[in-house]
């Protein structure tokens, strides 16, 4: 049984840095009485022990206050640092190409890593953790996102929904959670295509932003992602910025061939890093996904996984890999405070270390192989109990181990 603290989630607590959707959800949870998450269980054979989930306020108290402070100078330094790294890589391109196709591949990998690092700085902007001025955040966010052909305002909208409803089976649109019923309804070609190791890369970038499989196109102002006219205007503004950057790249390249090989291909490697990192932050054998009656903000965030990639990648990508759990509880914490904030989160979750809701962290030097393997293995979700889902293969392995 999982019960929420009698405090509930304070409606005034900075659940995700002031996101309206989460504040509203928190207000509802404040009224909830403790409940048995295994009520009406379909498959459970034993009753789980009673577990008291911490409140958001408990996490906030455990994190040093200065972790919530934004330093504009430091934020700009990281922005300049990432642009400088990408510029240096372009100047160093002839040295890489000296080694032929292998050198070109290595160059693209570096471009993908540093492109994703720039994306993380823009990601701070859309959360409001770049500076105290949201207008400045939005301006800088476009500077960071547009060269990456990532429309800033639409990303801001869809990403806030992901944070507000993490691991909610219906409302978390950051990932397409495929259920058994979805799998059965799929055409055979799609069931064949999904397990292909690189299918995640092919599906999510740039097809995801262009066509929007689960939450609507990020470029089309009349897609299902946008409700208000102001959002549609923002979509157009961000889309124009992306197209302007792509045109500037074409002008500099001098030909469509050069534009493809030296702008679009490295852009696709950025997309690969984006897919790998975001996928592994939330997809794992142990992760649970919840239906509406079983979901809560804290419960969903505890399924997030910190992964240490090593080789300097975590520092280069601003610790969005190994500080992601803290980021999900408080997304207004700047990336340069995430590791310190993580220590506070770990202390709060320590009493739950032997449960499904403990702090989840892995050292994954094999992150690329793990991404490919999970994309093949973790095909669809089935009910673990009523309202609680896990991947089919996870439950089958548990059943065989008994």
From Swiss-Prot:
It catalyses: (9Z,12Z)-octadecadienoyl-CoA + 2 Fe(II)-[cytochrome b5] + O2 + 2 H(+) = (9Z,12Z,15Z)-octadecatrienoyl-CoA + 2 Fe(III)-[cytochrome b5] + 2 H2O; (8Z,11Z,14Z)-eicosatrienoyl-CoA + 2 Fe(II)-[cytochrome b5] + O2 + 2 H(+) = (8Z,11Z,14Z,17Z)-eicosatetraenoyl-CoA + 2 Fe(III)-[cytochrome b5] + 2 H2O; (5Z,8Z,11Z,14Z)-eicosatetraenoyl-CoA + 2 Fe(II)-[cytochrome b5] + O2 + 2 H(+) = (5Z,8Z,11Z,14Z,17Z)-eicosapentaenoyl-CoA + 2 Fe(III)-[cytochrome b5] + 2 H2O; (7Z,10Z,13Z,16Z)-docosatetraenoyl-CoA + 2 Fe(II)-[cytochrome b5] + O2 + 2 H(+) = (7Z,10Z,13Z,16Z,19Z)-docosapentaenoyl-CoA + 2 Fe(III)-[cytochrome b5] + 2 H2O. Its main location: membrane. It is found in: Membrane. It is an enzyme of class 1 (oxidoreductase). InterPro entries: FA_desaturase_dom, Fatty_acid_desaturase. The keyword Chaperone does not apply. Disulfide bonds: none annotated. One of its GO terms (molecular function) is oxidoreductase activity. Pathway: Lipid metabolism; polyunsaturated fatty acid biosynthesis. Signal peptide: none annotated. Pfam families: FA_desaturase (PF00487). Its EC number is 1.14.19.-. Keywords: Fatty acid biosynthesis, Fatty acid metabolism, Lipid biosynthesis, Lipid metabolism, Membrane, Oxidoreductase, Transmembrane, Transmembrane helix. The chain crosses the membrane at residues 79-99, 101-121, 235-255, 260-280. Omega-3 fatty acid desaturase that recognizes a range of 18- and 20-carbon omega-6 substrates. Introduces a double bond in the fatty acid chain three carbons away from terminal methyl group to biosynthesize n-3 (omega-3) polyunsaturated fatty acids (PUFAs) endogenously (PUFAs are essential for membrane structure and many cellular and physiological processes). Belongs to the fatty acid desaturase type 1 family. HPO-19 and T05H4.4 are cytochrome b5 reductases required for PUFA desaturation in Caenorhabditis elegans. HPO-19 knockdown or mutation alters FAT-1 desaturase activity. Although FAT-1 lacks a cytochrome b5 domain, its N-terminal contains a DUF3474 domain that may possess some oxidoreductase activity for electron transfer, obviating the need for an extra cytochrome b5 enzyme, but still requiring cytochrome b5 reductase HPO-19/T05H4.4 to become activated. This is Omega-3 fatty acid desaturase fat-1.
